[in-house]
Amino acid sequence: MMSKLTHIDQTGAANMVDVGAKDETERQAVAEGSVRMNLETLALILEGNAAKGDVIGAARLAGIMAAKKTADLIPLCHPLMLTKVAVEIEPDQTLPGLRVRALAKLKGRTGVEMEALTAVSVTCLTIYDMAKAVDKHMEIGGIRVTEKGGGKSGDWKA
């Protein structure tokens, strides 16, 4: 674990980290999360009968778009030239609900954990938005980074 917060300077003020001297390397991050819902709501989504349309398709696109906007949403986050963002949404009858996984990749000087987390978060929020009319008890949770690769600190898995 690092000994200090990198986005705070010596005086305690917010600071955008200078990554200009870092080498460009292939980097990737994977994040996950889930939306718990009633089994009836899950069935409605999987059958394509939600009033707002294709929940899974819309949520996937929203997550990809959100990853590309991470620097606009998170203060001090570097704007990145992502080379890939992939969002997977899988039904889980035992949850019950939808499990979301996002992969973000680039060749650059800083990691893509925030982009993967943003993709998962907005995907889950979109699922919630599109199904809230039929299920007021949905719960978003478990959002975390599960792996990262590349850069000076190397590879990591949860």
From Swiss-Prot:
This enzyme's EC code(s): 4.6.1.17
The keyword Lyase is assigned to this record: yes
GO molecular function: cyclic pyranopterin monophosphate synthase activity
Swiss-Prot/TrEMBL GO biological process terms: Mo-molybdopterin cofactor biosynthetic process
Domain of life: Bacteria
Stated role: Catalyzes the conversion of (8S)-3',8-cyclo-7,8-dihydroguanosine 5'-triphosphate to cyclic pyranopterin monophosphate (cPMP).
Name the record gives this protein: Cyclic pyranopterin monophosphate synthase
Organism: Brucella anthropi (strain ATCC 49188 / DSM 6882 / CCUG 24695 / JCM 21032 / LMG 3331 / NBRC 15819 / NCTC 12168 / Alc 37)
Gene: moaC
